[in-house]
Amino acid sequence: MNSSNNNDSSSSNSNMNNSLSPTLVTHSDASMGSGRASPDNSHMGRGIWNPSYVNQGSQRSPQQQHQNHHQQQQQQQQQQQQNSQFCFVNPWNEEKVTNSQQNLVYPPQYDDLNSNESLDAYRRRKSSLVVPPARAPAPNPFQYDSYPAYTSSNTSLAGNSSGQYPSGYQQQQQQVYQQGAIHPSQFGSRFVPSLYDRQDFQRRQSLAATNYSSNFSSLNSNTNQGTNSIPVMSPYRRLSAYPPSTSPPLQPPFKQLRRDEVQGQKLSIPQMQLCNSKNDLQPVLNATPKFRRASLNSKTISPLVSVTKSLITTYSLCSPEFTYQTSKNPKRVLTKPSEGKCNNGFDNINSDYILYVNDVLGVEQNRKYLVLDILGQGTFGQVVKCQNLLTKEILAVKVVKSRTEYLTQSITEAKILELLNQKIDPTNKHHFLRMYDSFVHKNHLCLVFELLSNNLYELLKQNKFHGLSIQLIRTFTTQILDSLCVLKESKLIHCDLKPENILLCAPDKPELKIIDFGSSCEEARTVYTYIQSRFYRAPEIILGIPYSTSIDMWSLGCIVAELFLGIPIFPGASEYNQLTRIIDTLGYPPSWMIDMGKNSGKFMKKLAPEESSSSTQKHRMKTIEEFCREYNIVEKPSKQYFKWRKLPDIIRNYRYPKSIQNSQELIDQEMQNRECLIHFLGGVLNLNPLERWTPQQAMLHPFITKQEFTGEWFPPGSSLPGPSEKHDDAKGQQSEYGSANDSSNNAGHNYVYNPSSATGGADSVDIGAISKRKENTSGDISNNFAVTHSVQEGPTSAFNKLHIVEE
């Protein structure tokens, strides 16, 4: 700037200082010797002791003083805008700028502007006047922990004298002083333009902030004593928010950047293309940069980690008052649906108690079971994983529905488990579930059990529904048979034996336990007729015949076959489809069962004499068309999961494990084990419940005892009932059963004690052998025979006249 501008600036500063004096005097009337001059001192030569001025100031009211002070400030601002001139200095220590186009990109119409023109011509500029340097990637964040202090020797303005300034600000002041672009007396002016705003250094530093150098000495202190501690500012706008990243000796090629900007760059506008298929897509893979903002080599914290894994720490840094406790988390609901509809809002529409995580059960009866998670949900209610807050033990709690029918059934289960745990199996050796406690919570019966692992169905699912090894099947079958032996001796029926109700004690041990005695009953009190899950339902239940503990043996046979095959052997979609699958695989049940069954007429059709293929075949299964037409339902044909229909063929032709496919010796051993398994399944899957093996008999089979299987095996001391002169009805039923085995429709069926049929042969049952073994039968009705204790309504002569003597 020229000297005239300097004089104007100095005069404006003096006027500003003089204009502040009246306010200072009026605010401090007692300090009359303050040495400040009135606005008239420069013209009248009077000091502050002018009586007219003192009297005039003392007579003014505070409101008038405030208005005058406001008017004076407006005049000062207008005078400053008129007197201040714009001065730009190259911040990168380039040669002295004489023409604005040498370092600024201005339109042609401003070429003739000289340095004395007003700044008003430049207010319309929207583009940045300075091209900022590139930011350094992956900086060291500890570099900005502290800045070199920049303090002034003058403390006339206390509010601005204690701040710290970065070295970039000092660097610019040093360059401006060395170039002589501004007179030293103007360094104290607050309107000298600067690249730096003090607010820029109070903002949060970026992860890629620039590198400030502190290799420059501070400015001389012999500047204007009034405002030398205020940072140099631009009157209207900051030129750039980014200070230079290098020191003057290492000048970056900014000339090339400005030259490119003058020449202009072509903008790449993205174009939209129609894509009809994925082949039209042409993705561009950008190369990964060598250095990233948040890398393993940098000391910065990844923003992604700070807002995810370390979110609590981030909140704590932002607000010291922030606290977090997991106990205050909203409780996660475990029951679906979770809307309260019954029981004062505690139950949903299905009468299930609405459970939440961290709920405490049993408080009303001095129990404390903390709910952790849900284990399962069924028709009876829910099973949740809980912790006993008194003993710190992890348990399973069964929360029964609040309906009366489910409550009655659960009370029966609790009584049976109490009988098993305390009297029948107090030593916990026979693989029964242990019940520890029972209580009522919000009108719901809660049973506390030991916590077990996965069930057998989940085990098959983990094995991708491939069959297990015969050795593991033998281990599981032995434990289940041990439990069934205890139940038969106690005259108890489980009534719902299936893979879902057989649980592993631990995921790494082949130890089992039987659960869910909610459907259990005593042999003498068989009240319900619709029991068992469909896949494992015995034929006598489907036909409507009185049942006994033999139905559990049928379920065991279905479970063993499923463990070997990986899928259920009889996956019926309905009762009609279930009975169809059983007959296709094992043959027709004996005629006395069909005649005696209450539901036989629903699935069977009695043959006319001319339609019967033999004198003993009196019934046949209804076709799908006949069954659907009669009951007005839609029944789909059975889906075949196996290539073969008969049980022996299914077992023999099941795929070999990969571990033995290359060894003929291992294959021969596998086939021998399969023949033993076929014979075992033939005994427990006998359609006749009177001839079906008991648990005690099955425990002696070579498949369980690992004895050598020669192809023939009979339970020790067992005998089959045969024709008897005393019991004509029994004779007719047995002869009818034996002759039915001769029909070609039952060829290949594995009948109970015939070894040839167990190997898949078509020979009929040897009636002579059966007649010889009948001599060992006793004439008295055995009280141990289960069916005699479960007789319901209807004819029972066949059950009362047949008997088996058990050891």
From Swiss-Prot:
* Catalysed reactions, as listed in the record: L-seryl-[protein] + ATP = O-phospho-L-seryl-[protein] + ADP + H(+); L-threonyl-[protein] + ATP = O-phospho-L-threonyl-[protein] + ADP + H(+); L-tyrosyl-[protein] + ATP = O-phospho-L-tyrosyl-[protein] + ADP + H(+)
Q: Which CDD domains match?
A: PKc_YAK1
Instruction: Give the protein family.
Output: Belongs to the protein kinase superfamily. CMGC Ser/Thr protein kinase family. MNB/DYRK subfamily.
GO MF term (any one): ATP binding
Bias (Polar residues): 20-31, 149-160, 732-758
Active site residues of this protein: D496 (proton acceptor)
Biological process annotations from GO: cAMP/PKA signal transduction; positive regulation of cell-substrate adhesion; positive regulation of DNA-templated transcription
What are the residue boundaries of the Protein kinase domain, all occurrences included? 369-704
Where located? Answer: Cytoplasm; Nucleus
PTM sites of type Phosphothreonine: T288
Q: Which is one Gene Ontology cellular component term of this protein?
A: nucleus
Q: Which domain of life is it from?
A: Eukaryota
Residues that bind ATP: L375, G376, Q377, G378, T379, F380, G381, Q382, V383, K398
The main enzyme category here is transferase
Q: What is this protein called?
A: Dual specificity protein kinase YAK1
Transmembrane helix found in the keyword field: no
The reply on keyword Lyase is no
